[in-house]
Amino acid sequence: MRGLLSLIGFSALLSAAVVLDRIAVIAGNHVIKASDIDRDIRLTDFLNRAQLNFNASAKRESAERLIAQQIIRDEIVSGGYRRPPESEAAQLEAQLLRDRFGGSQERLRQDLERYRLTQAELREQLLWQITVLQFINQRFQGGIVVTDEDARSYYDQHTADLKREYPKDSSFDALEPKIRSSLEGERINQSFNEWLDQARKSERVEFKQGAFAEKGVQ
């Protein structure tokens, strides 16, 4: 009898785990679980220094982020794009530790505990952010052209703002490299967003009913 009760108890635990980690979204050939959404919300709110929010809207936004991540991952694999080394995530983590926590590992650990995150999960998220930025540059930078006319037009339209921002030398010659870099960055981001929007529209996505119910902060 005791063995039977133990089996029943174990089965109940397994059932609870299945409910907790139910499939939330099917995107193409990929499955996004409830635990993936939970972790993404915790990481996003931690990095944004925001209060944890698990309402239906936050879960839906998280699901869309994770769908986009899968699209990008598929493109990285199919396109053979180079991935950054893990050491770059360690460098970004060190910068976060210095700028936000005054170099205190204990303060970082306590904040991670408050969001129920591990340092390994944080580092993985930082590595992913670097991966996305590197992919965007590799994939879209090559087709971007900023002409002399583009740079001059931007300068003429924003002269007053540029003079306030760079009072020592706001001449066109001095600011042209910054203007070109800014315009290039804007156009790279625009090309990336247009590509991602189109890819998202082409993706077969199924949201599972009941997976986005609001829950309290845990």
What are these regions (language model features)?
Residues 18-26, 32, 53-218:
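Peptidyl-prolyl cis-trans isomerase
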